[in-house]
């Protein structure tokens, strides 16, 4: 029986290279969300059933799979990578929310939620669903987990429809999750 060495597996989990495409796409989404003045979406009286279902149930599927798949495959390195990316995403999202709360760009306060609350930018829900889907696609297989891709825009639309975030905030949130995957995840060796 192999001895599990925590420090060794942690060091193995640190990526040797980065996906330049994923990093460029994520930084582009963050900059787009922060600097483009998207129009305010009018308040909705009702939320479509698909978005209600996504907000309360479906958005958890990628997050559960991002932990379950490494466990099922006994992929300790993948488990460390999803943990590192999740911790980094949570920290980066909440630090950015506080840093941008009182920043105004194009006569729009980035921290102002559509209903008047604070800590709008970036969306934590969008960052976590983006992280989970991007992790599964980068670590294991784009083709195998392509079916999860629609959950990203559905989660983003649900947050907008529920008047919880602006369009820019959900785009920046998606970029934040993808950025952390790009920095902390490498494809699994098929050997």
Swiss-Prot record:
<feature type="transmembrane region" description="Helical; Name=3">
    <location>
        <begin position="117"/>
        <end position="137"/>
    </location>
</feature>
<dbReference type="GO" id="GO:0009245">
    <property type="term" value="P:lipid A biosynthetic process"/>
</dbReference>
<keyword id="KW-1133">Transmembrane helix</keyword>
<protein>
    <recommendedName>
        <fullName>Lipid A 1-phosphatase</fullName>
        <ecNumber>3.1.-.-</ecNumber>
    </recommendedName>
</protein>
<feature type="transmembrane region" description="Helical; Name=4">
    <location>
        <begin position="145"/>
        <end position="162"/>
    </location>
</feature>
<dbReference type="GO" id="GO:0141043">
    <property type="term" value="P:symbiont-mediated evasion of host innate immune response"/>
</dbReference>
<feature type="transmembrane region" description="Helical; Name=5">
    <location>
        <begin position="164"/>
        <end position="184"/>
    </location>
</feature>
<dbReference type="InterPro" id="IPR036938">
    <property type="entry name" value="P_Acid_Pase_2/haloperoxi_sf"/>
</dbReference>
<feature type="transmembrane region" description="Helical; Name=2">
    <location>
        <begin position="60"/>
        <end position="80"/>
    </location>
</feature>
<dbReference type="GO" id="GO:0046677">
    <property type="term" value="P:response to antibiotic"/>
</dbReference>
<keyword id="KW-0046">Antibiotic resistance</keyword>
<keyword id="KW-0472">Membrane</keyword>
<keyword id="KW-1003">Cell membrane</keyword>
<keyword id="KW-0441">Lipid A biosynthesis</keyword>
<comment type="function">
    <text>Removes the 1-phosphate group from tetra- and probably hexaacylated lipid A species. Absence of the 1-phosphate group renders the bacteria partially resistant to host-derived cationic antimicrobial peptides (CAMP), allowing it to camouflage itself from the host innate immune response, and plays a role in the long-term colonization of the host's stomach.</text>
</comment>
<dbReference type="GO" id="GO:0005886">
    <property type="term" value="C:plasma membrane"/>
</dbReference>
<dbReference type="Pfam" id="PF01569">
    <property type="entry name" value="PAP2"/>
</dbReference>
<keyword id="KW-0443">Lipid metabolism</keyword>
<keyword id="KW-0812">Transmembrane</keyword>
<feature type="transmembrane region" description="Helical; Name=1">
    <location>
        <begin position="22"/>
        <end position="42"/>
    </location>
</feature>
<keyword id="KW-0378">Hydrolase</keyword>
<dbReference type="GO" id="GO:0009103">
    <property type="term" value="P:lipopolysaccharide biosynthetic process"/>
</dbReference>
<keyword id="KW-0997">Cell inner membrane</keyword>
<dbReference type="InterPro" id="IPR000326">
    <property type="entry name" value="P_Acid_Pase_2/haloperoxidase"/>
</dbReference>
<keyword id="KW-0448">Lipopolysaccharide biosynthesis</keyword>
<keyword id="KW-0843">Virulence</keyword>
<keyword id="KW-0444">Lipid biosynthesis</keyword>
<comment type="pathway">
    <text>Bacterial outer membrane biogenesis; LPS lipid A biosynthesis.</text>
</comment>
<comment type="similarity">
    <text>Belongs to the lipid A LpxE 1-phosphatase family.</text>
</comment>
<dbReference type="GO" id="GO:0016791">
    <property type="term" value="F:phosphatase activity"/>
</dbReference>
